[in-house]
Amino acid sequence: RLLKFFLLLLIYTVILIFTCGKQGAFFSVVMLLAMKDVNMDNKNYKICFWVGVVFFIVACYLNKDGAEAVRFMNGEWVNMNKRSNILYVAFTALVCLYLLKYRDRLNNMRILGVVIVNYLIYLYVGSRTGVISIIFLVVMILLFRSQRFRRMKIIKYGCVFSPLICMIFSIVAGVKYDEYSFLKILDMMLQGRIAQNNAYLDRYDIKLFGQHIYEGAENGDFWNLDCAYLDMLICEGLIFAVLWIVVSTALIKYMYNNNRMVEVAILVMYAIYGISETFLLNCFLNMSLFLYGEYLYIQFNKIPNPIRC
């Protein structure tokens, strides 16, 4: 049964390579398949963390001089020299690995350490989305220590349905961009991402198996879809977008019901991060995919939850 499931996923993601031209979903499925019989305990998270630290330090050094990038500043697109936001995405992955490693021993000193390093990385990279995401993650973990907070239905269902909420927000904000002034203000804060979402929704139809989309800046005409949810919907297609939301919702509900609140905080943080980045399908950058793999194997093998906090 499990083999048939992954075989279908592999065939489906191979089809997506031809229909949309992106390989992220395929390699993520390969990673999930490789997780068979691998117990993602603290030891494995520790190994992943320290290997990641080495590569992150090397990446920071190689990117020390920055590179030319196009950014939306004061209502217009401008060229500027800055360090890549991918560095912050990679740092976020390291933070998640660290939190998963110490999920049972996550004291205030370790959390304070995360906050301090987060600020230092922000000074080096300058990604507002990244620094806010880590702060949100830390705040969520601290709030989840309260039984009363965890038992609030609005919190539980807000977390469980966060992927769907973020998907709906991305679509509605893109469609209604020209109708509401507050969306234009929010667009400037998000460096033109909502305007780009609006442009892509106008330019492309939604297809079941996705399509190739143009991204580039030829003749000063800048096109860049920097939203994971619209990238799934437009590029990977309606089937994939629905599948992602359904599985993500089920996963967060499972973690919440089993009191695995560090994992819930990580999953919700990534769900929100996807509003302004497209790396959710990248198994090298999205560490929550380890949790997807764990959940799928538990469901198919009908084994008990290995960790209850």
Residue spans for each PLM region:
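Hydrophobic transmembrane helix bundles of membrane-integrated enzymes that assemble
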Residues: 1-181, 202, 220-307
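Alpha-helical transmembrane signal-anchor/signal-peptide segments
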Residues: 182-186
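TM-adjacent membrane-interface loops and short helices in multi-pass inner/ER membrane proteins
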Residues: 194-222, 238-240
